[in-house]
């Protein structure tokens, strides 16, 4: 089995390493601009599938594509990119429930069989002061993360509760769903753990 993660994200790579199965990483190409009136669910499913397909053009094997966005009050939040936007995002999220949509796609590039699913995960934020938000951003600099936080780091202090079936989903790669998808492709991860 040749498993390829269609991602340059160090977070997704770290998550997949938890399974102790061999894999490589490849840089995908996909236009991440949402289409007109595209829902968060549809957007992440489309992008996860496109990322896997883009890598499948040049590489053979089972290719994992993934994409994630956060949604609050019906608005899709992407990666902030800088401190000012991150501050604005966290101010907007303060005291609210945020739903994270994570698209996961598995492509067999030899047969072109592809399955795509979307996992959701809810995060309930504490009411945060401007001082708390500024201090958090000073310490963690989560500018490359949807929602402007790292739940696997200091970001956990921003939340009052979490609700979802797999905490890895929140970081960007739903492992429980991935193991089930691999099984559908007749891959038992236990046989490949090293």
From Swiss-Prot:
The protein's required cofactors: a divalent metal cation
GO molecular function list: nucleoside triphosphate diphosphatase activity
Intracellular or extracellular location(s): Cytoplasm
Catalyzed chemical reaction(s): N(7)-methyl-GTP + H2O = N(7)-methyl-GMP + diphosphate + H(+)
Top-level division of the source organism's lineage: Bacteria
Site annotation Important for substrate specificity: residues: 11, 68, 152
Active site: 67 (proton acceptor)
Gene Ontology BP terms: nucleotide metabolic process
Record key words, sorted: Cytoplasm, Hydrolase, Nucleotide metabolism
UniProt-listed InterPro entries: ITPase-like_fam, Maf-like
Family: Belongs to the Maf family. YceF subfamily.
Protein name: 7-methyl-GTP pyrophosphatase
Organism taxonomic ancestry: Bacteria, Pseudomonadati, Pseudomonadota, Gammaproteobacteria, Alteromonadales
